[in-house]
Amino acid sequence: MKVVLDTNVLISAFLTDGICARILRRARNREFAFILCRPVLQEFLRILREKFQFDEGEVSFFTAIVSEATWEIRQPENPFPGICRDADDGAILVCAAEADFLVTGDDDLLILEFYGKTKIIRPREFELLFSN
């Protein structure tokens, strides 16, 4: 199963020991193939530094964990503008085009429900896939 995690899921994985942290642990354990979108990585690093003011050592540590969990890194070549309400989300949709799931807490993405064959779901819904 190929999965793209949005920035908000990655940030939450490091700030709380909840569902998003469990999802990242599952990626590290190779329970699914985590596809990292380069713009998501860039936004993740920016938010860690600017909003949460983590120092470079902490940012490097977090980056190493995400890298360890990553199965593939994708750089969207042509993010389509106007696909969703937030124009910046076009890049993640292009990255997720061949994934089975895009896991996010972003309502601008969730409202779409699907992008091609990719199901767009909340972290809680994704975690439930592992409860059987």
Q: Where do the PLM segments sit?
A:
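Extreme N-terminal starter segment of soluble prokaryotic enzymes
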Residues: M1-K2
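Residues at secondary-structure transition points
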Residues: G18, I35, G57, F61, ...
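Active-site neighborhoods of divalent-metal-dependent phosphate/nucleic-acid chemistry enzymes
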Residues: E68-L102, D107
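Acidic, PIN/NYN-like endoribonuclease modules and their adjacent C-terminal/linker elements
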Residues: G82-I83, D107-N132
